[in-house]
Amino acid sequence: ILLISVFSLIGKGEICSNKFGSTKEIEEEFNKTWNRLVPKGIPFKSMYTTPFWHLASEPFWNVYTSDGSSVDDIWHKPIMSIKRQRKELSAIIDFNLYNIILDNEIRSAIIAHLESIVRKGLNL
């Protein structure tokens, strides 16, 4: 859901680089997407901070501190407050992926595919 949210914000021009901070806009888009895709009663909580960290294990997503340092396992705390995360963290997605996502047709197809994966994962 976080990828869908980030890709949507890229499409809206609200994320204009492959490097971006953990922002209120991303959180709001995540919550909007969550509410649209995840039915009420599902035992998961809408917290964009969790996938922000989990995506760090993917080769196309890197998490950095505000001073540009890579986040290591000791500092890696997925439960950090949203306020602290907004202040201290940035993500960088692969430059080639970012350029692909700029294409409206490709972005729409990828978002549709990711949404179908979410629905399948929730058995909808």
Please tell me what each predicted stretch does.
Residues 1-124:
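Intrinsically disordered, charged low-complexity linkers and terminal tails
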